[in-house]
């Protein structure tokens, strides 16, 4: 409870940064023994977003949108999205892929704003999952 009270005092940008840290740690741990979602190499992985987190904040913390990705594909190949998309469909299935894409399209029409309580919920969820 004390943690939640301390989190409520933080700004949205500070909460988002904390949430990103815990979420990315979860993704790296979840996918640590798997190959890069784009190129298939077994190497140190980062949390690579299929739909850009900056352009599509609604799916920033969506586990179907973020997978282990090598630094080369994530940074130097801008996500290496063509093989990422096919491997993503293979991994999560067409239905979940379509749902993810629909969420992005819908948010572009309706807009999306961060909420302190939503971010605190994400922080608490992924902090617990990382224990």
Show where each model-derived region lies.
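Short Cys/His-rich Zn2+-coordinating modules
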Residues: 16-25, 50-56
């Amino acid at each position: 409870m004390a943690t939640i009270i301390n989190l409520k005092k933080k700004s949205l940008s500070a909460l988002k940064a904390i949430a990103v840290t815990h979420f990315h740690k979860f993704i790296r741990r979840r996918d640590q023994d798997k190959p890069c979602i784009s190129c298939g190499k077994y190497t140190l992985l980062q949390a690579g977003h299929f739909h850009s987190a900056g352009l599509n904040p609604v799916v920033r913390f969506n586990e179907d949108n973020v997978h282990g990705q090598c630094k080369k594909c994530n940074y130097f190949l801008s996500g290496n999205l063509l093989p990422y998309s096919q491997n993503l469909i293979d991994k999560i299935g067409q239905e979940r892929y379509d749902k993810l894409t629909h969420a992005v399209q819908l948010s572009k029409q309706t807009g999306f704003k961060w909420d302190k309580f939503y971010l605190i919920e994400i922080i608490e969820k992924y902090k617990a999952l990382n224990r």
